[in-house]
Amino acid sequence: MRKTVVLAGGPVVAAMLVIFMGCSGDATKAGPVASPSGTPSTDQRDVVTTFPTEQHQPFEAPPELKSTNGLLETTFDVHPTTFNVAGAEVRGYAYQGQFMGPTLRVLPGDVVRVHLRNRLKEPTNLHSHGMYVSPIGISDNVLRVMKAGSNNEFVLHLPRDVEPGTYWYHTHLHGHVEEQVFAGLSGVLIVDGLQDRLPPQLQDVPDQVMALKDLQVKDGAIVRSNIDSNAPTTRTVNGQVDPVLTAQTNQTQLLRLANIGADIWYRLRLGGAQFHVIAEDANPVAEVWTADELVLPPGKRYDVLVRWPTPGSYALETLTYSTGPDGDNYPQRRLATFEVTGDTVPDVAWPTSLGPVSPLDTDHVDRTRNVVFSENPKTNRFYINGKQFDPTHVTFVAKLGTTEEWVIKNTAREAHPFHIHVNDFEVMAVNGKPYHARSEQDVVPLPPRGEVRIRMHFKHFVGATVFHCHILAHEDNGMMGIIDITRSGRLSKATIKSLKEMNKAMLGQHSTDMGDGAHTGHTMEMPSR
């Protein structure tokens, strides 16, 4: 995916993308990209400009909001604004005035209540990525349209058995997702409790939120249209360029690595230290595993423990990376620096397990579905089972309480990160080879011309939700489908009504064609069951 046209204005990663794709591109020095000529051009790489950034400043965590007595209540005043990114004033979109949205920190069983005031000139909405909550009403309903100028309530009732770990939130209105996330509308959401599963000696280790968030700037503003992932891009950690963190020799730290950007991938390495993965996509792992590198497509999260063996400087870098012949080629960049000094901290044994994996590999499979991701690079259109997203078309209906196996094929010559809302899944096989899952997950890359087999159980929540490619440009340009989870296994009247309301609201906000055939007057298409 090179240039995009916005319509409206874990181990499995490493196994698939290193083995089946490899990496390409020339390594470049860490730091800002050399400024292009600035000559007007239709090629985004020629019009994006770099901006002066402060580098190597002390690390700053995003602002944090914590629940009190079971409730986290806040206001998101969504508006265009000018904020500071790495020492430079940049225009973009914000939830609470900053490029980094506040970190929301809650506990299982809590209620999250957001008063969302949309002060944009376009519609928006809000999504809690990876969260096991209801997809209907004023909850995690991405089919809801929050109109320009409107005031809205967004309420999450977290189950008491929701898994602890790192989630994130972002705008999710089809046709506007890439531009709004790229402009700044994303942040981290943490469900506490992961540390409680660690050995007592590790439960109070430093807890660092490290949100990977990128931007491109032209004329002092974040680019929001004709975004080209190969154009000069500033990669930040919490909005900082190469911030400096400190640690004591042999100290253990918890790093919450989250790719909360719109389109680009990261191939992370921490020179001289290793990643000990304790949770993937906010799912505590049944077996703690160790990696020298981690690949994070858009939307991916890893909670990792890191121990600094000797004094010195350690660079967190993203290495050169290719997503395939028709995909993107990313350069090497330094993201953060860890300065390790002081007396050696005594050794502490690593944990071996933080939670069981649901035994989906032994479950009875009630239904098998074939899902095909495809694209037309010449027209910049993307498809699931031959169709672009249509708010009047339900792709699948699933019955509550059943287990399904999906065989997801990617016919494109670039990787697509598959994501589904509400229910996480377990990877069964990659390109026909059995896969040993250490946890469930909510994002998995589909290799170019490859195949991934997953299983998921629809255990509690009913309602219509979506699955899609988490390269948000691809989602906006068609690569998304709707799944209706019902008690009967038949399309619900409530879903038909809500989709018609969504379609009416979207057409009332803009007249852009949302894909092949998604126009006023369409009748509801019957889904595959």
Predicted features by range, described:
Residues 31-298, 304, 310, 336-353, ...:
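Histidine-centered copper-binding motifs that mark active-site loops
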Residues 24-27:
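Bacterial signal peptide processing site
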Residues 166-172, 309-323, 459-473:
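Short, surface-exposed ligand- or partner-binding patches at beta-edge/loop junctions that are enriched
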Residues 433-476, 482-486:
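C-terminal structured "cap/appendage" subdomains that terminate the fold
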Residues 370-380, 384-427, 442-462:
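C-terminal substrate/ligand-recognition segments
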Residues 271-282, 411-439, 472-475, 484-489:
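Active/binding-pocket-proximal capping segment
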Residues 5-16:
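Sec-dependent N-terminal signal peptides
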Residues 19-22:
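C-terminal motif of bacterial Sec signal peptides marking the signal peptidase cleavage site
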